[in-house]
A protein has these predicted regions:
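Acyl-donor (CoA/ACP) binding surface of acyl/acetyltransferases
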Residues: 1-114
Length: 114
């Protein structure tokens, strides 16, 4: 895997009236699944978003069929807000996504990631 990305994570900040809100997105190569990497990264970036960027809301929209991604969000305190029916197309197939979010009022800081 030398020289290749193993995953990615980021926040896309909203603009104008949504400037204190951000969308969280992430991916991890299959060889690294099941090691807690994504959960640790989501916790760390969520903390950074609320504490350093002064966000009031962070949301994510994983595929409804992605139980592992949904579990990561739930372990990090995100709450399911709704189903986005037929909202994405992956490999030519129209699929549903789910909306998960966490607000600054519900955020519970955790210990720094070692």
């Amino acid at each position: 895997m030398r020289g290749e990305a193993t995953g990615g994570i980021g926040l896309e900040l909203g603009g104008d009236i949504e400037r204190r809100s951000a969308e969280l997105g992430y991916w991890l190569g299959e060889a690294f699944w099941g090691k807690g990497i994504t959960t640790a990264a989501v916790r760390a970036l969520t903390g950074y978003g609320f504490e350093a960027l002064n966000l009031t809301r962070i949301f994510a929209v994983p595929f409804a069929s992605s139980s592992a991604s949904i579990r990561v969000l739930e372990k990090c305190g995100y709450i399911r807000e709704g189903l986005m029916r037929r909202s994405a197309v992956k490999e030519g197939v129209v699929i549903d996504q789910v909306l998960y979010a966490l607000t600054d009022e519900d955020f519970v800081p955790t210990s720094p990631v070692a």
